[in-house]
Amino acid sequence: MDTLGIFVLISYLGLSSAAGVHLGDLQQNLAANGSVVVSPLNTTDAFSVSINLSQSTVNNCPSLKNAESMALMELLTRLTAPCRYDRMVPPVVHNKDGEEVPMDIYARFYIYVMKNLDSSDLQFTVQGLLQLRYLDPRLAFSSYLPNRRQPIMGESELKKMLWVPHIFLTNEQASTVLGTSAKDELTSIYPNGTVLTSTRLQATLYCWMNFQKFPFDEQKCKTTLESWMYNTTLVQLHWETDNPVSFDKQLQLTEYNLIGSLYNESIRVSNESYMSHGSLEGNYSIISFTVLLTREVGYYVIDYFLPSIMIVTISWVSFWLQADQTPARTTLGCTTLLSFITLSLSQENNLMKVSYVTMSEVWFLVCTIFIFGSLVEFAFVNTIWRRNNDLQLKKRTTKYIVKSTFVPHLKKHRRHGYRRTDSTMSTMSTTSMDKTCGPNNTVITIETPIIIGGSLSREDSAISLDEQDETSTSESSDSSKEKPAQTFATMTPKEVSLWIDRKMRFVFPLSFIVFNALFWTLVYCL
């Protein structure tokens, strides 16, 4: 009620009390000045006046007639007036039968940039445009502007006037809305009440990665959008049927190749035992898309695998060096081993520490075994090279050479029951003669050499005892029954060392080729 109406009311009340003017005339005159209700007055008794003061915006909403002559801002203000629109309440949608149904929200995601796919932090950064489309019948203006086909568009100011669904990224670590002078947000309202919101954002998302086939791994990084406040009884999320997830044609990654994407819709249950939405319980709608990535292996092949193959090959050069060249073969083996370990450590620093074995670690272990094996082979042939006794072989084959190499004459000496002891003899000069009558009564004289006090070596004493065993006739019956094995070939220790080196020149490369065949088959076929 305005000031003019109150003034007229007081004037008429004063006149009626003084001159007895009828109250009906007063009500007729006040009808055009506001919503004032005056109770009937009794001129003889004290009268009372009841005035109902209320705002015109509550009783009467702003009219939308002649909307064609209104400015867009005025039209939006009247459409979103509190008497018509409550931005705190989601729109109510009915089906064809008039039943209330959940509101469908359709999403589309356009990705401009993907970067910082960090294996150590298990995260990646994405810049994209997120669009949400839904129907709000309260904002339909086709009946007021039948000739308008274009949507009403605005930025963040328009968005603040509307109800907008709260959608969040469940695996985000940080996110922000992009923009320079203002946030890059665009809101469009179509004549039928369809609302389309577009937001350009940047988000750092968590991505669980599996490195079992590193560096030949394929990663699947997932992005999940979920309704925060409203469960499936009110809001349901869906992907657009046409290109729900798309990528910029100029999108390039430094370490990965983008091979495609998958998208999915699901439901998450929130209850007392799984409080994903705080104190809110119910089923919440989820939409997600997964980016399929394959790692670029060019860098690792050139900087790791080829150099490691060359280092392993260089370690085999020692097989062409003579077994007594200790400095050369030792230096070559140690240098190649240390070089390969240094090369591997520089690559492993790029990988997150995981509890399972990766393909790169398998490669590292096998290559280390090959390099270390060449060092062990040198130590073995060098030991054989320094032996003094020849090897007695039945046949000059690998079987008997290896057997004679690992099982020396010690076995034969133990079989005859002799112990290797150091014998010390004092200075003496004796000549012993064993006379044995031959078939023709011939006397055989055996002269024993004089041994001047000294210590016999283990090997010489064993040989001396062995020779006496073969010529003596007074041995026990058990030892006389055993006959020494017949030998058909003899090899010197140097010949054995050279023979082993020649064999290793083929065994090591062939074994490494077989390993490579198995390794690359597992990499690309499993």
UniProtKB/Swiss-Prot annotation:
It catalyses: chloride(in) = chloride(out). Its main location: membrane. In third-instar larvae, expressed in the principal cells of the excretory Malpighian tubules (at protein level). Also detected in the enterocytes of the copper cell region and the iron cell region of the larval midgut (at protein level). In the copper cell region expression is confined to the interstitial cells and in the iron cell region it is expressed in the anterior portion (at protein level). Expressed in the Malpighian tubules and the middle midgut of third instar larvae and adults. One of its GO terms (biological process) is regulation of renal water transport. PROSITE patterns: NEUROTR_ION_CHANNEL (PS00236). It comes from the Eukaryota. It is a multi-pass membrane protein. InterPro entries: GABAA/Glycine_rcpt, Neur_chan_lig-bd, Neur_chan_lig-bd_sf, Neur_channel, Neuro-gated_channel_TM_sf, Neuro_actylchol_rec, Neurotrans-gated_channel_TM, Neurotransmitter_ion_chnl_CS. Residues 322-327, 382-505 are cytoplasmic. Residues 1-18 form the signal peptide. The chain crosses the membrane at residues 301-321, 328-347, 361-381, 506-526. Disruption phenotype: Larval lethal. Larval development is delayed due to decreased food intake and reduced systematic insulin signaling. However, escapers eventually attain a normal size during the pupal and adult stages. Unlike in wild-type larvae, mutants do not develop a preference for zinc supplemented food or eat more when fed a zinc rich diet. The copper cell region of the larval midgut displays developmental and functional defects such as reduced luminal acidity, increased bacterial titers and enlarged cell volume. The interstitial cells also display increased cell volume due to reduced basal infolding. GO terms for cellular component: apical plasma membrane; brush border membrane; chloride channel complex; late endosome membrane; lysosomal membrane; microvillus membrane; postsynapse; transmembrane transporter complex. One of its GO terms (molecular function) is zinc ion sensor activity. Keywords: Cell membrane, Cell projection, Chloride, Chloride channel, Endosome, Glycoprotein, Ion channel, Ion transport, Ligand-gated ion channel, Lysosome, Membrane, Signal, Transmembrane, Transmembrane helix, Transport. It holds the Pfam family Neur_chan_LBD. Residues 463-488 are annotated as: Disordered. Residues 19-300, 348-360 are extracellular. Belongs to the ligand-gated ion channel (TC 1.A.9) family. Ligand and pH-gated channel that mediates chloride transport primarily in the mid-gut and thereby functions in larval metabolism and fluid homeostasis. Channel opening is triggered by zinc binding or, to a lesser extent, an increase in extracellular pH. Zinc-dependent activity in the mid-gut is required for modulating Tor-dependent metabolic programs that promote larval feeding and systematic growth. It may therefore act as an intestinal zinc sensor that mediates larval growth and metabolism in response to micronutrient availability. The name 'hodor' is an acronym for 'hold on, don't rush', referring to the developmental delay phenotype in mutants. This is pH-sensitive chloride channel 2. It comes from Drosophila melanogaster.
